UniProtKB/Swiss-Prot annotation:
One GO BP annotation of this record: amino acid biosynthetic process
Protein name as annotated: Shikimate dehydrogenase (NADP(+))
Coiled-coil segments: none
Catalytic activity, as annotated: shikimate + NADP(+) = 3-dehydroshikimate + NADPH + H(+)
PANTHER family, A to Z: BIFUNCTIONAL 3-DEHYDROQUINATE DEHYDRATASE_SHIKIMATE DEHYDROGENASE, CHLOROPLASTIC, SHIKIMATE DEHYDROGENASE
Species assigned in the record: Saccharolobus islandicus (strain Y.N.15.51 / Yellowstone #2) (Sulfolobus islandicus)
Top-level lineage group: Archaea
Molecular function terms, GO-annotated: shikimate 3-dehydrogenase (NADP+) activity
Residues spanning the signal sequence: none
SUBUNIT field: Homodimer.
Keywords annotated in UniProt: Amino-acid biosynthesis, Aromatic amino acid biosynthesis, NADP, Oxidoreductase
Lineage start: Archaea, Thermoproteota, Thermoprotei, Sulfolobales, Sulfolobaceae
Gene: aroE
Catalytic residues as annotated in Swiss-Prot or TrEMBL: 72 (proton acceptor)
Length: 269
């Protein structure tokens, strides 16, 4: 953490609602110190009324911001521009000087490439239909996933995501649950890791979890139980943060160093 704030200190932060649990300030303030950057990262926990009242002011004074639930889509109308990926996905989680980016998308692409490479021939089941689900669905589609099935509590959001994916030339549909028998990739973008049935995990080649507290959720435990490859929520959180710092500073601390720091501080378990 920066020991002294002065005239030249740059402001960064996270915008969201009910986000006291977040690790983002620990990650970024550690990175700023490690990289020797005169900056501070704060949390802006805003209800909808506060968000609408102060978002323009935050965009004026902050050098860069991250955005989480429930504002990844809403924030776009306040920005001057968005990059190709966030425009297509219609969700932003990283802002730099009023420009929007989606580093959730970049993180999923990076991590899936490391785990299994090309997704050709895989059927992907995405649980949830919010901003994280959009990023995951687009990333997996761009890696070659043959079909995307959206599993969500309500059909309204699921239909919107399916239409968006199909409009961009991908093969998407709504499913009540996974019913394939092989070459499955399962993504949980909801706050509830138990939403994915165990029999679905058993048939998977790769499991992707967005929840990171605890790191070993029920979904990750089951993936380990059946010797399934997995990407946990901490990996996603850290990699998207690293990608955000590359946008802000064109440099970053390594994923491994950040994760080591979080465990050493007992901030994750």
């Amino acid at each position: 953490m920066l020991e002294e704030i002065n005239y030249d200190t740059k402001l960064f932060g996270l915008i969201g609602k009910n986000i006291k649990y977040t690790l983002s300030p620990y990650i970024h303030n550690f990175s700023f110190t490690t990289l020797g950057i005169n900056a501070v990262y704060l949390v802006f926990d805003l209800d909808e009324m506060k968000f609408n009242r102060i978002i323009n002011g935050l965009l004026e004074i902050a050098e860069g911001l991250n955005v989480t639930i429930p504002y990844k889509e809403e924030v776009m109308k306040y920005l001057d521009n968005t990059d190709t990926y966030s425009t297509r996905i219609q969700a932003v989680n990283t802002i730099y000087k009023k420009g929007g980016y989606n580093t959730d998308y970049l993180a999923i692409k990076n991590l899936v490439r490391k785990k299994i490479g090309n997704m050709s021939g895989y059927e992907c089941y995405v649980y949830g239909a919010g901003g994280a689900a959009k990023a995951a669905a687009f990333a997996l589609s761009e890696l070659g996933c043959s079909s995307i099935s959206i599993v969500n509590r309500t059909n309204l959001r699921a239909n919107e995501l399916v239409e968006l994916l199909n409009k961009n030339g991908y093969n998407a549909s709504i499913k009540e649950n996974c019913n394939s028998t092989s070459n499955i990739v399962v993504v949980n973008s909801t706050p509830n890791p138990s939403v994915v049935p165990e029999n679905c995990i058993q048939k998977s080649e790769l499991v992707i979890e967005f929840v990171y507290k605890p790191v070993e959720t029920e979904l990750i435990k089951n993936a380990k139980k059946y010797s399934i490859k997995y990407i946990d929520g901490l990996e996603i959180l850290v990699n998207q943060a690293v990608e955000a710092e590359k946008i802000w500073f064109n440099k970053s601390v390594s994923d491994e160093k950040i994760i080591e720091y979080l465990y050493a501080r007992k901030l994750v378990w």
